[in-house]
């Protein structure tokens, strides 16, 4: 409440203007025309909204280069303390999280856990192209989440690669306006039905490429006939010695490789003979 200084006038001033001095406060009923400059009328919800928008505490969360732009706000050049922003390192003391940087599939459960540990009401600002859509990793990356809104609800989207500190301040101002316009009905429905906590995406599942067995193929373990003819020591004898010195758990595998090598060499020899006959 703001009280106008004109109400604090002495008794002499009232006598000069023709008002009778009174001692009982109940009979003092002076209504001024400019009452709007003297008293502020508001509701309890607007008052609490004003308190919350003036004390947003962001969580320090950064996974990529966008966090460098966010960290520059702490300096004296931009000074985001004037907006009531106090950076916190614990999610239990924060009500705002700015997801600055790329969100990977491995980091997604940790991000959801941080969001769930934040007390209500809580807000999210998606900062950067990588956070909003996956950015340059959205085409052929198997480990990047295509938008953080697949994991947690987002209140303000801040595009850029990376966004400037002035853009971050503008996003905070827009979030402050949203907080100031919230009603009591909206506060009771924080858990909206649109919020989805999932890691699903539109990528098609494919078989794993790096299975560890690519070097166990016959063509990679046994060279061709050209290399066999260039060696002074027969390659078949080398493989036989390796089978004798190997462990018993690998005998069947090595024997199978040796048989495959013999069959492949026989096929190569037949192909060479056929080519020579055709040339003749």
From Swiss-Prot:
InterPro entries: NADH_UbQ_OxRdtase-like_20kDa (IPR006137), NADH_UQ_OxRdtase_20Kd_su (IPR006138)
Location of this chain's protein in the cell: Plastid, Chloroplast thylakoid membrane
GO molecular function: 4 iron, 4 sulfur cluster binding; iron ion binding; NADH dehydrogenase (ubiquinone) activity; quinone binding
Keyword Iron: yes
Cofactor(s) the protein requires to work: [4Fe-4S] cluster
UniProt region (Disordered), positions on chain: 257-280
Cofactor note: Binds 1 [4Fe-4S] cluster.
Keywords tagged on the record: 4Fe-4S, Chloroplast, Iron, Iron-sulfur, Membrane, Metal-binding, NAD, NADP, Plastid, Plastoquinone, Quinone, Thylakoid, Translocase, Transport
Topology in the lipid bilayer: Peripheral membrane protein
First-tier enzyme category under EC: translocase
Catalytic activity, EC: 7.1.1.-
Pfam families assigned: Oxidored_q6
PROSITE patterns according to UniProt: COMPLEX1_20K
Gene Ontology cellular-component annotations: chloroplast thylakoid membrane; respiratory chain complex I
GO biological process, one term: electron transport coupled proton transport
Chain positions recorded as [4Fe-4S] cluster binding sites: 65-66, 130, 161
Subunit structure: NDH is composed of at least 16 different subunits, 5 of which are encoded in the nucleus.
Entry function: NDH shuttles electrons from NAD(P)H:plastoquinone, via FMN and iron-sulfur (Fe-S) centers, to quinones in the photosynthetic chain and possibly in a chloroplast respiratory chain. The immediate electron acceptor for the enzyme in this species is believed to be plastoquinone. Couples the redox reaction to proton translocation, and thus conserves the redox energy in a proton gradient.
Family that this chain belongs to: Belongs to the complex I 20 kDa subunit family.
Protein name: NAD(P)H-quinone oxidoreductase subunit K, chloroplastic
Naturally occurring in which organism (per UniProt): Staurastrum punctulatum
Lineage: Eukaryota, Viridiplantae, Streptophyta, Zygnematophyceae, Zygnematophycidae
Gene for this chain: ndhK
